[in-house]
Amino acid sequence: MGVGISVLIGLKSVTLFILFATLKNYGYPLLSIPCLYASLVSLLVAVAANPSIDLPILLGKNSDGTFPIWSLVMFSPYLYFVRAFSALRRTKSGEPPYSEISEGLYVGGWPCSLDKLPPGNPAIIDCTCEMPRMLEFTGNHAFLCIPTWDTRSPQPADIEVAVKWACRKRAQKIPVFIHCAYGHGRSVAVMCALLVALGLAEDWKNAEKLIKEKRPYIRMNALHRKALEEWSKDRLSSPKVGVSSVILSSANDRS
């Protein structure tokens, strides 16, 4: 599966604690305090992001994609670090901010500005728990948030919620943009399920291949694939829902 967020942020916590101890020993107690605080925040995030706990609500992200003031203050060492790291990584990668997988279906990274959004005023599915919805998007785009830790997967039930929501938007001829931090894991898992639900792929494995053709650097891990397997099994055990049913439901649900 590779190194997950718990390991990476855990190492960051240890590094910051060593820096705290070093500064304190060299007689810089005031400079050492921010390092200690950042170390403790990183440790808390590493524990909460562990797959056995998986508590993305820790960061307090609202359903509209914004963060409350208390979260921005309390978790500032983590929240602003991941935003800065994301911006730097995407600048150096040269990868496009989004890719069109099929007509009206886009997957990509966190849209930090309007030019990072696909055309056509798309409905947005945000798969992050750490990235904010930018203020310029508020009210202009239909929005759904399924908060998920980086390198982790949305739960099968959350995937189904996102798929049904996206199907309604497509029935209304509205483009759909699914994003995570980089458009490589969390968002790809949801897009795989959506392609299957819309009849554009036979199963999630074929959907993954289709997405990889359009966005070569995607890399789902074992957690993403496990969630998709569970989602697929639940879908097979549930009554079949055709495209016509989705269109009819969209007429009653325009949210």
Placement of each model-derived feature along the sequence:
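Non-catalytic regulatory/accessory regions that flank a structured catalytic core
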Residues: 1-103, 233-237, 241-255
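Alpha-helix initiation/capping motif
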Residues: 3-4, 68, 109-112, 155, ...
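Cysteine-based protein phosphatase catalytic domain of the PTP/DSP
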Residues: 74-178, 182, 193-239
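Glycine-rich nucleophile elbow surrounding the catalytic serine of serine-hydrolase chemistry
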Residues: 184-190
